[in-house]
Amino acid sequence: TLENKSIKEICYLGHKNALKTYLTLDDNINLMQLGNCEMLKSYLDKLELNKYRDVTVSNLSFGQQKKLALLRVFLNNSDLIILDEPFVGLDDSAHTVLTSFLNNELDKNKSLVFTSHISCNINSKILEIPK
């Protein structure tokens, strides 16, 4: 049950990215006070965001903003991740990376709940609701 877990262990990302558009990509990551996270460089590389670290979020494309928001979710290291349409706005490469991230989180025995109109290859139980 979740009754004994603190709210810090649950991470939700809705259809709005919850980014501070007047700050840079790095500033948005630093707001989370994660310290020196080993995974950060790897995630930035995989999501092709390294070259945008000093760019103001308002100058990033929708897809880049989405990747940044998802990056913050994974750096948060929560036991339960809830995502609303995480694949919207992502190109094929980012879709593949996100699928890999999600499967990696499931391999770490985390729980994942998400909605999607876009097909994905997640290694877990999937409930499809017919139209």
Predicted regions and their residues:
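Conserved ABC ATPase signature
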Residues: 56-63
